[in-house]
């Protein structure tokens, strides 16, 4: 459902009578109230409550990678004083998954494929096995059931390497079973897009890619930067003697930034009014998760954050991030981070020329992670408006018909909001299609609730700007407004409607709330709380598992990757406390529950904070995890009661 006209919250059927909860427990700040009959017995007098570092959802391992994608974290996670286990994040988690014991050459995975030739020239020169009998004898036992990829497409690209091989392999004829009619029928609506072609990737890696759009843009902005830097230094010296008058004059000069002497391409239009938006989420916001969210009502999804420099250099892992499922478009955005206008311009041009299914390119101006901040990326741009504006201008002029959007925070320091000033400058000096504001500062992180009053204040600025543009548009052109989206602490339909009904706010972006409760947009549509049963929630996890295998592959390596990312997903979903066992509503995103017991064993299992139980859940769909499966939870204190 897209909200065309904002409705007062009291007009919505916020919740049915069956979901009303009497407030029989005294309110304890930060503590979720559980009905007494569902409280688990504790083994000590100390009520242990797990602590989460939710900034991890934004970093997703980026705290250990520099702008070029290289590992740069030397903190090895030592034990604290008295040998006690530390709290917080497990840095440098070893997440590499192992493959088959005998590694089969890719040309052998389909016995009927005579066209593909071994890159090494044959079995005698190849480091991989060409002996199918040997490979099948050493291969792990098949997983029970039907291959999810074969079931979806009628054909499994993993061939003999598939962990569900028995479901599409004829042992008598020693041939793979293929339903080519189904494959032809399904592939048009079930495939991945935004896959960079080999020629373009090699050109980027060898610095031979034709950046004919961004090169003049970079040169112009670089010349303007040098002039402005010299002018700024001179004005700062004058300001030290002439006082505030010169400072105000300098600000006026900055506001009258000279436009580039070339025309920006006409952009595709986006409409975010009332859109159900899933925030960019690194690691957990992967393609299978986004695909799941599309089935649960999401209108707009974003890629995981990609770094502009490695994108412009053709770095393979970085180019895996813009990939999307065909069902995500239109409405799919690629988020990038950059501290340099030249890198952002090149990344934007490369995306424009090599992808066909991108609705917007979003500049991350809010990531709080220390490493990116020190490099001048993410939230560091909030304290450097001229640099941010140069980057946006460079992207906008280089991205062809793809519009540019930004995601910001209230500011860098707590109690020092700068977004109003920043947004005014961005509106005056750039042509961003949308601005998303997370209602927290970098310093604040998730220690306090998002400031929605300030989000509304900034929304009014954007609304005034749009009205001013409409008044100035005397020719009656179809001017696309700059959309304004609020973000922070949205965990229910009440939160969503409270946000979208604020003045100047076109829509609301959901982050952690959509990880913990993936059906949140179904609640928005129904305008009431949905007490999902444990079997319904398990069905969502099964769908995620199938999507994960389709994405990463049904071979040993692909299944291990699917299991690892499913565990990452479960590290958020287990935090959901069922509506039916809560003493009062609404539930707050930052509230932590005491240890509780569900209404049945499955509900208790789904709420377990023990990562071993998460692995047990994955085994329902991905088979038994091998002894060599590696998964280390992000948080050292991963259970309510150790």
UniProtKB/Swiss-Prot annotation:
Q: Which cofactor does it need?
A: FMN
Return the EC number.
1.3.1.89, 1.3.1.-
Q: What is catalysed by this protein?
A: 5,6-dihydrouridine(47) in tRNA + NAD(+) = uridine(47) in tRNA + NADH + H(+); 5,6-dihydrouridine(47) in tRNA + NADP(+) = uridine(47) in tRNA + NADPH + H(+); a 5,6-dihydrouridine in mRNA + NAD(+) = a uridine in mRNA + NADH + H(+); a 5,6-dihydrouridine in mRNA + NADP(+) = a uridine in mRNA + NADPH + H(+)
Q: Where is the composition biased (Basic and acidic residues)?
A: 1-10, 223-254
Q: What is this protein called?
A: tRNA-dihydrouridine(47) synthase [NAD(P)(+)]
GO molecular function, a single term: mRNA dihydrouridine synthase activity
Major enzyme class: oxidoreductase
Q: What does this protein do?
A: Catalyzes the synthesis of dihydrouridine, a modified base found in the D-loop of most tRNAs. Specifically modifies U47 in cytoplasmic tRNAs. Catalyzes the synthesis of dihydrouridine in some mRNAs, thereby affecting their translation.
Give the family from UniProt: Belongs to the Dus family. Dus3 subfamily.
Q: Where along this sequence does the record place binding of FMN?
A: 280-282, 335, 407, 438, 487-489, 511-512
Query: What are the record's GO terms for cellular component?
Result: cytoplasm; nuclear periphery
List the residue ranges of the region (Disordered). 1-26, 51-97, 223-258
Q: Identify the catalytic residues.
A: 367
Q: Name one GO biological process term.
A: mRNA processing
């Amino acid at each position: 459902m897209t909200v065309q006209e904002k409705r007062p919250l009291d007009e919505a059927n916020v919740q049915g009578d069956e979901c009303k909860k009497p407030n029989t427990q005294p309110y304890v700040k930060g503590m979720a109230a559980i009905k007494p009959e569902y409280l688990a017995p504790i083994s000590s007098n100390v009520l242990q409550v797990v602590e989460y570092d939710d900034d991890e959802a934004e970093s997703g391992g980026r705290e250990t990678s520099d702008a070029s994608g290289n590992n740069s974290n030397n903190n090895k996670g030592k034990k604290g004083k008295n040998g006690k286990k530390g709290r917080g994040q497990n840095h440098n988690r070893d997440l590499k998954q192992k493959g088959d014991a005998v590694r089969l050459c890719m040309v052998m995975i389909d016995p009927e494929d005579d066209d593909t030739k071994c890159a090494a020239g044959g079995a005698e020169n190849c480091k991989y096995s060409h002996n199918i009998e040997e490979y099948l004898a050493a291969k792990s036992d098949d997983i029970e059931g039907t291959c999810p990829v074969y079931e979806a497409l009628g054909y499994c690209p993993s061939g003999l390497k598939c962990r569900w091989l028995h479901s599409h392999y004829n042992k008598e004829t020693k041939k793979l079973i293929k339903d080519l009619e189904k494959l032809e029928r399904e592939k048009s609506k079930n495939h991945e897009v935004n896959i960079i072609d080999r020629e373009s990737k090699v050109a980027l890696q060898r610095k031979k890619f034709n950046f004919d759009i961004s090169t003049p843009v970079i040169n112009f902005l670089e010349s303007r930067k040098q002039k402005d830097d010299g002018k700024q230094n001179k004005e700062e010296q004058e300001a030290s003697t002439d006082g505030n008058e010169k400072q105000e004059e300098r600000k006026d000069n900055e506001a009258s930034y000279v436009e580039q002497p070339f025309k920006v391409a006409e952009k595709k239009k986006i409409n975010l009014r009332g859109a159900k938006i899933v925030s960019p989420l690194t690691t957990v916001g992967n393609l299978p998760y986004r695909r799941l969210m599309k089935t649960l009502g999401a209108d707009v999804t974003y890629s995981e954050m990609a770094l502009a420099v490695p994108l412009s250099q053709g770095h393979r892992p970085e180019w895996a991030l813009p990939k999307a499922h065909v069902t995500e478009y239109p409405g799919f955005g690629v988020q990038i981070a950059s501290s340099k206008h030249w890198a952002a311009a090149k990344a934007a041009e490369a995306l424009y020329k090599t992808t066909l299914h991108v609705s917007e390119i979003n500049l991350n101006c809010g990531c709080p992670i220390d490493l990116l901040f020190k490099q001048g990326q993410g939230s560091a741009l909030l304290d450097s408006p001229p640099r941010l504006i140069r980057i946006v201008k460079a992207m906008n002029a280089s991205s062809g018909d793809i519009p540019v959007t930004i995601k910001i925070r209230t500011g860098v320091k707590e109690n020092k909001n700068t977004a109003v000033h920043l947004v005014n400058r961005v509106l005056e000096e750039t042509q961003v299609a949308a601005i998303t504001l997370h209602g927290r500062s970098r310093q604040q992180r998730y220690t306090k609730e998002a400031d929605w009053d300030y989000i509304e204040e900034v929304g009014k600025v954007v609304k005034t700007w749009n009205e001013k543009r409409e008044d100035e548009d005397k020719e009656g052109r179809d001017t696309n407004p700059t959309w304004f989206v609020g973000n922070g602490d949205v965990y229910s339909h009440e939160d969503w409607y409270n946000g979208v009904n604020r003045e100047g706010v076109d829509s609301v972006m959901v982050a952690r709330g959509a990880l913990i409760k993936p059906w949140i947009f179904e609640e928005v549509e129904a305008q009431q709380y949905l007490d999902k049963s444990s079997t319904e929630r398990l069905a969502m996890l099964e769908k995620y598992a199938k999507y994960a295998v389709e994405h990463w592959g049904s071979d040993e390596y692909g299944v291990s990757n699917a299991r690892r990312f499913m565990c990452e997903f479960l590290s958020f979903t287990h935090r959901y406390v069922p509506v039916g066992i809560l003493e009062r509503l609404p539930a707050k995103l930052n509230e932590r529950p005491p240890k509780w017991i569900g209404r049945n064993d499955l509900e208790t299992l789904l709420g377990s904070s023990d990562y071993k139980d998460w692995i047990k859940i994955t085994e329902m769909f991905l088979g038994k995890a091998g002894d060599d499966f590696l998964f280390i939870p992000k948080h050292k204190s991963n259970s309510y009661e150790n």
